Amino acid sequence: MEGAGPVLSILGLLLVSAPFGVLGERPSADLGAHPERGSQVSPGTTEPRRQPPPKDQRERARAGSLSLGALYTAAVVAFVLFKCLQGPDEAAVLREEKNKKKSSQSEQQLVQLTQQLAQTEQHLNHLMTQLDPLFEQVTTLVGTQRELLDTKLKTIHHLLQDCQPGTGVEVPEPEASIPFTEDLGKEDQEAGNSQAWEEPITWSPETRNLAPSWEVEQGLRRRWHKTVTKGPAVNGEQPLKV
């Protein structure tokens, strides 16, 4: 009913103008019936006064004009009603066309989206085919590194078990070390001057500078031999043979 407003306005104008067009001034019956009379009147003479038409003629003319006006208005009303009824149909048709256009556009968009999705799937498959060998290489490298780490850990564990004391492994006793000159000097200080030298050496300021180094070395060796031979005898062991 969008076009009903202007149609109704047009209908009102037609209804108002129809009676004026139908009921307008009509020529008199006398002039229509006797046209010669007007031509016979001389210009100098005065025109005689028109006589009013009889009552029957006026009623007939009025009835004819009313019938024509009624027919005209009926035709206009019928036309307007037809247009008003046809208007909603046209609006519905236009809406259907718009809906069809929208549906066709949506279908085209769906088709384009499906094509784009198919292209992206193809690209992804291509990338996966390129990345598969890389993944395999990485997995193999990881496996080899893990195996190496496992073997290293196992070897470390075995070594720790072997090195632990009290597991049945005999630990070798430390051998008797040869005493140094410093240790011998400390023992002499602790033992005191009770022990006598086999060949005591008397030192003096004059002979200290003259004594050669080999004599000092021989004296130290004798002292060390004496301490070594006395040590095991005190503990009840056999003396070491040098």
UniProtKB/Swiss-Prot annotation:
Main localization, broad class: membrane
Compositional bias annotation for Basic and acidic residues: 47-62
Keywords: Coiled coil, Membrane, Signal, Transmembrane, Transmembrane helix
TM region positions: 65-85
Region entry Disordered, spans: 27-62, 186-210
InterPro entries documented for this protein: CCDC107
Chain segments annotated as coiled-coil in the UniProt record: 97-132
Localization per record: Membrane
Membrane disposition: Single-pass membrane protein
Signal sequence bounds: 1-24
Cellular component terms per the entry's GO annotation: membrane
UniProt superkingdom: Eukaryota
The name this protein goes by in its record: Coiled-coil domain-containing protein 107
Organism lineage: Eukaryota, Metazoa, Chordata, Craniata, Vertebrata
